[in-house]
Amino acid sequence: MDLMDRPHLAWHLSGGTTELLLVEPDGRNVQCTRIGGTTDISAGQLIDRTGVLLGLPFPCGKHLDQLSQNAIEKDFFQVKCPAMEFSLSGVQNKVEQYRANHSPQETAAYALRCISYAIRQATTNALKEYPGLEVVFSGGVASNSMIRHDMRMLNAIFSKPEFSTDNAMGIAVLANRLREG
């Protein structure tokens, strides 16, 4: 919990949002400033849309993650991320095109590699502007094994996957800090 007492970066990766935040202590609370993320659809939306395209059960995150484990190809679309923001709607079109000539396993991995690349680029750019800060990953998409693997070199902090599925843990931590404070 001492992380809450020093500045850090935080990703909220879910079906509803993909935001990169600068988190700064403010007494027992924190101030969060959005500094990056998607400008359109969220990572979770792209994951679910890819899963539906592949006939997976909804919500698709866990199933897409499992399906991608057997992929061999390393193809991905390099999302443009000149600063800390990026668009994923074009990736959805690329995934649909990719699916026409590739297996479900390869398509699942392709979509996840595109998402992971964009997040990694935005994080790398943020660390240039805010050097030395740790990066916390939360939200359901943060339980994805490819994203967890790809972010390991970026001062990344992940909770256990079972605590990454919703925001209940974060709300509980903040409520406890305010109660104590």
For each predicted feature, which ranges?
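Hydrophobic (often cysteine-bearing) scaffold residues that line and stabilize catalytic clefts
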Residues: 43, 147, 168
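A contiguous, well-structured pocket-lining segment that forms one wall/lid of small-molecule binding clefts
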Residues: 66-135, 141-158, 176-180
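Glycine-rich phosphate-binding/hydrolytic loop that grips phosphoryl groups
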Residues: 159-181
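Active-site nucleophile and cofactor-binding loops and adjacent substrate-binding regions
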Residues: 11-13, 40-41, 136-139, 159-167
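Hydrophobic side chains within alpha-helical segments
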Residues: 48, 125, 169-170
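A short helix-loop
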Residues: 6, 11-14, 18-105, 181
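Conserved phosphate-binding catalytic cores of ATP/NTP-utilizing and phosphoryl-transfer enzymes
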Residues: 1-9, 173-177
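Short, glycine/charged-enriched secondary-structure capping and boundary segments
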Residues: 4, 24-28, 150-153, 173
